[in-house]
Amino acid sequence: MLVIAAFAVTSAAAQFNPQQPIPADKDVRTGKLENGMTYYIRHNEKPKGQADFYILHDVGAIQENDSQQGLAHFLEHMAFNGTKNLPGKMLTEYLEKVGVKFGANLNAGTGWDQTTYMMKDVPTSREGIIDSALLILHDWSHFIALEPEEIDSERGVIMEELRTRDGASWRSTMKMLQALGKDTKYEHRNLIGYLDGLKGFHHKELEDFYNQWYRPDYQAVVVVGDIDVDAVENKIKTLMSDIPAPAADAARKETITVPDNEDPIISIYTDPEMQGSKIQLFVKRPALPEQMNNLIYGEMFDVIQAYMTTMENARLQEISMKPDAPFLGAGMGSGEIGVIPTLNATTFVAMTQDGKLAEGFEAIYTEMEKVRRYGFTQGEFERAQNDLMRRAERAYANRNDRRNGEFVQTYLNNYSKNTPMPDAETEWQLDSMLIKMINVEAVNGFAQQVIYNRNQVIVVTAPEKEGIVNPTAEELLAIREKVANAEIEAYEDNTVKEPLIPEGTVLKGSPVKKTAQDATLGTTAVSYTHLRAHET
């Protein structure tokens, strides 16, 4: 296991049990109903007098069969076209009247593995509004009307969305997903579906998807805001109890893993509409097992990745500032790729001038190889440590200013990924300890395990225009081979460590112009007359 190997080289590994779960924040009320539905409730007054209401369905487009492509997203639309208790457009009309505007505050989103419905900034001054918001979550769980005439009416809306979405950026995203999810179901799901399928699917196909996957054991309700936690919990328990539990033989979600590839998978997508040239290099690896996400192991894993990306991005920024830089900008990431839950990656990306992708690719591949061979220096590590500590200190200092949406996202992630949801004090203590405890040898050991020459995916997106020459797959492979066999020097850390003003230097002062006392603060303000180098 990657994190175990990295942890083994830290000097303070015996100070605590890395398999210990991270305790949950006691200010969030959680529970599971008999039908399997999970809930999270928290009182928060940022902003005062408002609350966010969410329901997460832990299913999405990847649960579609071939004849249902696009129907997870279609179903999301239907949730706003009539439910058991709010037929027709009553749902949106009511929420608009109380200030919850469609698009800004009332919305939903369909992904490959999740579908989320949300009402944000809902006023909580009247109990009736809270009751109505919970009733809407109830209907979104299991009581969407799916009236035949509404389904047929919505076909045109979604086909228009397909048309407007089908731009160069979306097409390039789909090409990237096809490369990353090659030989899996992810290669063949585009979220919105295809024109012929949207025109001709039978109503029963949509109903079948709905009945199979919209069920409480794959659902979490989240309410965060200026509410009475006890009262909301009682309302949820009462209101959601009529949602039926799934049958014992109900279908279970399939865990989809991406197969290894020995040779690089290369995707080159050019488009006359594309703005800018970009090349991405992914080094795939399995995601950390979900059961480890809530352990100290998982948090340490994240901190090590933060060290690695912080140091490498500093190197890439240093290169980009040179007059002859091979790219306009570059970056490195490590961890989730945001689409396939079972897949993580070490990712390098470069944005270049049009026609300069080959040079950009050689540069980022060289930097990747440099990290693999030599790792990072102690000086780089110390600067990264200071940076990470500043971030942790800033988060802790702002702990009382967290808005509803930040808490909501934490709880959604806890439900879908088993990531931790500690209180601010626990998070600060754990992160500050790990930042200080981890050493450069641990980060370098980790880097060697997640950077290698197999399981690579190379994705090129660039304009298709006369005069712009983009690299072929063969040329990219040749660059890769060239760098892999090249003699590469280790990174030289030339950062100035000495103070800008040597110790003991006597500086010539400026005359004092005026002083001012502040009795309240007990301070003295001093203004200087700054001398100019030249008088005219």
Predicted segments, located by residue:
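Buried hydrophobic packing residues in well-ordered domains
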Residues: 36, 55, 73, 117, ...
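Bacterial N-terminal signal peptides
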Residues: 1-8
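Scaffold signal of the M16-like zinc-metallopeptidase fold and its non-catalytic homologs
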Residues: 81-83, 108, 112-113, 129, ...
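Proteolytic maturation boundary segments
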Residues: 14-41, 228-305, 309-317, 321-323, ...
